């Protein structure tokens, strides 16, 4: 299996998560009178921030849409990192670790503030990222030592003697 496979799966998973997240953010019709009673104050209570009047609802929608674009950014980053993993695995490593760190933080946040679906998506994403590191021989494999790359330098960046 190519090292890019789990990273492409991460990209697809993030895109699917983005669709779910966006559909939740854009849903503005209350499902019940009680929910409508909760949303009305959020939509009507104004706060002046730096000279601009905003409602709590504005913040809810704005932050939700910002997260939507962050999902897409991570999906794109995972796809581009997959390309890199096949051609220059050592250069892909920091991007994979960065995504894994971000997903770890997301797992904690999801556990504290959200529900099962984001937790499951985050855990699957983390498993795929770890799998990509294993495929690249960067964790859990004796192949994680120094390897020669095309330009004659070792994978550690030090010139071979």
Regions found by a protein language model. Give the residues of each.
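N-terminal signal-anchor transmembrane alpha helix
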Residues: 7-32
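Juxtamembrane non-transmembrane "cap" segments at the membrane-aqueous interface
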Residues: 30-42, 88
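Juxtamembrane membrane-water interface segments that cap and precede transmembrane helices
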Residues: 44-60
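Mid-chain, well-packed structural core segment of small domains
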Residues: 62-99
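Membrane-interface capping segments at transmembrane-helix boundaries
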Residues: 83-84, 134-148
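Hydrophobic alpha-helical transmembrane segments of integral membrane proteins
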Residues: 87-125
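Alpha-helical transmembrane segments and their membrane-interface exit regions
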Residues: 124-136
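Short, intrinsically disordered terminal tails adjacent to the first/last structured region
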Residues: 142-161
């Amino acid at each position: 299996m190519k090292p890019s496979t789990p990273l492409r799966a991460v990209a697809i998973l993030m895109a699917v998560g983005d669709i779910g997240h966006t559909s939740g953010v854009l849903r503005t019709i209350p499902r019940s009178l009680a929910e409508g009673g909760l949303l009305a104050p959020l939509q009507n209570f104004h706060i002046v921030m730096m000279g601009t009047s905003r409602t709590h609802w504005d913040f809810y929608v704005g932050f939700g849409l910002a997260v939507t674009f962050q999902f897409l950014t991570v999906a794109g980053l995972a796809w581009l990192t997959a390309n890199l993993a096949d051609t220059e695995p050592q250069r892909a490593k920091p991007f994979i670790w960065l995504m894994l760190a971000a997903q770890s933080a997301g797992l904690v946040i999801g556990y504290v503030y959200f529900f099962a679906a984001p937790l499951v998506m985050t855990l699957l994403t983390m498993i795929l990222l770890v799998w990509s590191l294993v495929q690249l021989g960067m964790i859990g494999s004796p192949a994680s030592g120094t390897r020669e790359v095309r330009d004659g330098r070792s994978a550690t960046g030090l010139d071979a003697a």
